[in-house]
Design a protein with these regions (language model features):
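Short, amphipathic alpha-helical segments that act as regulatory/interfacial helices
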Residues: 274, 297-304, 315-322
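Secretory targeting and sorting signals
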Residues: 1-25, 45, 180
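Gly/Pro-rich cap/lid or specificity-loop segments adjacent to the active site
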Residues: 26-295, 358-360, 364-514
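Solenoid-repeat scaffolds in large eukaryotic assemblies
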Residues: 312-314, 373-374
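Structural motif
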Residues: 282-299, 305-309, 343-354
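Short, solvent-exposed helix-helix connector turns and helix-capping sites enriched
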Residues: 256, 307-310, 320-331, 464
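Acidic catalytic loop of the alpha/beta-hydrolase fold
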Residues: 304-308, 429-432
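Flexible "cap/lid" loop of the alpha/beta hydrolase fold
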Residues: 166, 224-243, 315-319, 326-335, ...
Length: 514
């Protein structure tokens, strides 16, 4: 079975010290060392902390590769970028073989990935575990809770800066894109091919802005749209695809006899559970702990990343909640231990790797006048989307309010010229990167072909055999699918004994990532 392309490794590893390097120095030879059990090689290279000061301090950037398994047919280097922000590329792609050995990517390319700056093995952003664990967990219900978010964000940002140092000011996506070109240069390649999904697509988009001529090919799967400046538009698009995904799940269950809720009013079951959770009257039969409406929505949201691995379990879980019986699947938890049934870290640590807010809040500037405006947005969304109410990605906005750091890479429309033809696969409904974001990105990237997957899910290389074929054909031969090509939805008709549900990536606070 194809493993997930957005496996996330969040835990921070080794923090390295900065050193200076002359701007004009030729790239030092890479000191590759064997890593993992599938033939990977790993190394660390030095890149500027601040590309505006190329002769200044450097940071360690961890990279890894799997050499082409058919070297006589090698095309070149394919850089595969993880999602997040905060996701490791080395752990899934180099150490754990998230891209199958028989794929064209593995056969004909040296597959190269990285832990992006500030993440994992690459001079990670670190924060006090105790402060991270103090995070508010819910959308603010009143002015006091809104002010608590503002105070917490200021406290966390100052704490992360204290434990990380000046690097924290330079983890924005523009620098992440420049890091890709540093990797290209140190590998001695004139051009690279690039594949990414989710947040990694923004890195690819900005790389195409900066270095369009250094791209041989670019396939960006499930796209961010970094031109969105409206808070309401951001929340609306994410909730729209959650509502659409839920309705697709209902239709699937109605037509799939093996679904645990087949023959029942699936929408009614969900709405009833949500009403009970919102009223504080829904308990987890397995633990006796209360389940909040936010936790219930996060469980639904999480299952929409991977229908093949999750929908049967989701239906069974909802049925057992409705019947008051224990279930093997757990309702999503959101952070620290509390009376709301959330769970904390398994063992105490002084600091943890937590790159997401430092990267995200360097990229996104949100204008919010105060609690009343946010509350009005929530009420509008609940009227527009009566079943799912509000996407859990409200946290993408809340975490940046009063963050004590510069927005170095604010939202903007892409300005790209001279890029190669680009393939942009997208789903009909995608809770991680909504359809509207993909269309928005496609309009900003010249020579883009949109590949439509008519199903639900995040990461179409995994979710659709049709999309996977087109992606690999394009990357190897540069042949794009005809414009207007659509891939049919692929949903399971019976539970699989071997399928493993791939959950959406979470931050250390339990909030979802891209």
């Amino acid at each position: 079975m194809l493993k997930s392309l957005f496996c996330i490794a969040i835990a921070g590893l080794l923090v390295s010290t900065s050193a200076a390097a002359p701007a004009s120095a030729a790239p030092a030879p890479i000191d590759w060392a064997a890593c993992g059990e599938i033939g990977g090689e790993c190394a660390t290279i030095k890149v500027p902390v601040d590309y505006a000061d190329p002769s200044g301090p450097t940071l360690d950037l961890a990279i890894g590769r799997l050499k082409a398994s058919e070297p006589d047919k090698r095309i070149g280097v394919l850089i595969v970028h993880p999602g997040g922000p905060g996701g490791s590329g080395i752990s899934p792609f180099i150490l754990n073989g998230a891209i199958a050995p028989d794929s064209a990517m593995r056969k004909y390319f040296d597959l190269v990935s990285l832990d992006p700056r500030g993440v994992g093995r690459s001079t990670p952003v670190r924060c006090s575990a105790d402060v991270v664990n103090e995070s508010p967990l819910t959308f603010p219900a009143n002015e006091a809770e809104y002010q608590a978010w503002l105070a917490y964000n200021a406290k966390l940002s100052e704490d992360c800066r204290e434990h990380t140092g000046a690097t924290i000011d330079h983890v924005h996506t523009t620098n992440a894109a420049r890091d890709i070109d540093s990797i290209r240069a140190v590998l001695g390649e004139r051009q690279i091919s690039f594949f990414a999904l989710s947040y990694g697509t923004q890195v690819g988009q900005q790389y195409a802005e900066l270095f369009p001529g250094r791209l041989r090919a670019m396939a960006i799967d499930s796209n961010m749209d970094h031109s969105i400046t409206s808070v309401f538009r951001y929340l609306q698009t994410t909730t729209e695809d959650l509502e659409g995904s839920f309705k697709a799940f209902v239709r699937w269950c109605d037509s799939t006899r093996a679904c645990a809720l087949n023959g029942e009013d699936v929408t009614g079951v969900w709405d009833g559970l949500h009403d009970r959770a919102a009223a504080g009257r829904l308990d987890d039969p397995a633990t006796g702990e209360p389940i909040t409406a936010e936790q219930l929505r996060l469980t639904l949201f999480d299952a929409m990343y991977d229908p093949a691995g999750s929908w049967f379990d989701l239906a069974s879980h909802l049925k057992t909640l409705a019947d008051g019986e224990a279930t093997a699947r757990t309702t999503a938890k959101t952070g620290k231990t509390s009376k709301t049934g959330t769970t904390g870290p398994r063992k105490r640590q002084e600091t943890v790797g937590y790159a997401y807010p430092s990267i995200w809040c360097s990229d996104w500037k949100w204008e919010v006048s105060g609690f009343e405006q946010l509350d009005q947005y929530r009420k509008r969304l609940e009227r527009l989307y009566p079943h799912t109410k509000l996407s859990p990605f409200w946290s993408d906005v809340l975490v940046c309010l009063n963050w004590q750091g510069k927005v170095s890479n604010p939202q903007h429309r892409l300005d790209i010229t001279g890029n190669p033809p680009t393939l942009l696969p997208k789903a009909r409904y995608d809770v991680g990167t909504p359809a509207a974001w993909n269309y928005g990105a496609a309009r900003q990237i010249p020579r883009t072909t949109v590949l439509e997957y008519d199903g639900v899910g995040h990461g179409q290389y995994r979710n659709s055999t049709c999309a996977r074929t087109h992606i690999e054909t394009y990357l190897t031969s540069l042949v794009l699918p005809p414009r207007g090509t659509r891939c049919a939805a692929e949903y399971p008709d019976r539970p699989s004994a071997t399928a493993k549900a791939e959950r959406g990536p979470l931050s250390p606070t339990g909030r979802p990532l891209h």
